[in-house]
Amino acid sequence: MCHLLKLARLVPTLSLLIGCQVAAPARVQAPPDSAAGEISFRLAGPGGAALLVPIYLNGEGPFEFVLDTGATITCVDQPLAERLNLPEQRGQIGLGAGVGGAGRVRLVGIDSLRLGAAEASGLTACVLDLQQVRAISPDVAGLLGLNFLKEFRVTLDFERNILLLQEAD
């Protein structure tokens, strides 16, 4: 019970973006055999409640991201966005909402985001201070959201700690 209460404090951050206006969807590429492959993940946080995956942004990484089906778009921690010099998406408005309130968020462009053999280009992401999320793991650098995940059939094999991405039908 105590672990659940600790995790509940992170929910406003992990599920921050439930609404965001963005211009164009990302272009997604999967390998020709339509299977984007198996990716190892690790569980972290109280009771293993967070699933962490290795992400490559603009050819750099890997960076540890939380797989977050509650996030409409992918989010990058502010220090990483600055380090990678991710360009701000002018003319687009990001609206974030969570248990803690609502407000505007900064949106940036990601040229390429790769998870295993699956890659998206032209992805929009928000920039957040993920300090609270780093309670799960000190290396968390972002949240992998639905603007990437929705393009795939996602299978989680908890027995082997494998995430399987397949091109959506």
Question: Model regions: which residues?
Answer:
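Sec-dependent signal peptide recognition
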Residues: 5-13
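Pepsin/retropepsin-fold aspartyl endopeptidases
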Residues: 2-5, 17-169
